[in-house]
Design a protein with these regions (language model features):
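Well-ordered, non-transmembrane segments within structured domains
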Residues: 2-3, 83-103, 132, 211-215, ...
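Bacterial N-terminal signal peptides
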Residues: 9-17
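Extended, aromatic/histidine-rich regions of cofactor-dependent oxidoreductases associated
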Residues: 3, 19-73, 125-225
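A glycine-rich, hydrophobic loop/mini-helix early in the fold
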Residues: 64-113
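Mid-length scaffold segments of soluble, non-membrane domains
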Residues: 93-147
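Bacterial N-terminal signal peptides that target proteins for export
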Residues: 1-9
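Short acidic (Asp/Glu) patches
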Residues: 86-88, 120, 162
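Stable alpha-helical elements in mature extracytoplasmic
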Residues: 71, 83, 115-118, 122, ...
Length: 225
């Protein structure tokens, strides 16, 4: 009798220990992982990068907040197949990375690792007219600018959705920024919602109508036709 009682006393702690050990994984499995804030990279392939914070807010209507659930990127104008793409559809193609420095006419600059799709690939998907002269870009806040079709199709110009390996923040132009390399910052349109292929080579965007060069080349004058 004493031997059975001793066995019972010994087994009870063991049972509780097993129950306790078995319950921990279940409790842990029930917890969802906590999503932490994405951290930008500050160097890439040996090159130092600026921060996403090294920009000045100078948009015409303040920071825009685009709802990804309702966002559409329209590709229209002189195309055979007009497109209205969700964010997922827009980036569901070959993605590219490139370090490009944005230079503002205000005198500051920022060197960023951009990631996105080639504008040319989007134009090809829509069946653009190669005889067209101009591509007009429109932003969520109504801002517009234009660039020659030859510039966009002859160079690896990106429509970026990431900078320094993090999604572009609202204040930097989410969901898309045009990486208009070798052009002044006012050509780097943010919050892009529409890409229109046109024959209107005389089109002037917001800053161009206010005296800035329509060419926007870093090697050319800031002001002028």
């Amino acid at each position: 009798m004493m031997r059975h009682r001793a066995s019972l006393v010994f087994l009870l702690p063991l049972v509780f220990a097993l129950v306790s050990c078995g319950s921990k994984p279940a409790a842990q499995a029930a917890k969802e992982p906590v999503t932490l804030r994405a951290v930008e990279v500050r160097s890439y392939n040996g090159a130092d990068l600026s921060s996403v914070n090294d920009f000045r807010e100078n948009s015409i209507e303040g920071v825009q907040h685009v709802d990804p659930a309702t966002y559409r990127l329209e590709i229209a104008g002189l195309v055979s197949t007009p497109l209205s793409l969700t964010l997922g559809q827009a980036i569901d193609r070959t993605l590219y990375r490139k370090i490009v420095t944005l230079r503002c006419v205000e005198g500051w600059d920022a060197t960023i690792l951009w990631e996105g799709v080639k504008v040319k690939d989007l134009l090809v998907a829509a069946g653009y007219d190669p005889k067209a002269s101009t591509v007009i870009f429109t932003a969520y806040d109504g801002y517009t600018t234009s660039l020659p079709l030859a510039y966009l199709t002859g160079n690896d110009i990106l429509l970026a959705y990431k900078m320094n390996e993090i999604p572009i923040p609202d204040e930097r132009g989410y969901p898309f920024v045009l990486v208009a390399e070798d052009k002044w910052g006012y050509k780097w349109i943010k919050w892009v919602t529409k890409i229109e292929v046109s024959n209107d080579a005389s089109y002037r965007g917001y800053w161009e109508m206010n005296g800035y060069s329509n060419d926007g080349s870093l090697m050319g004058p800031i002001f002028g036709p």
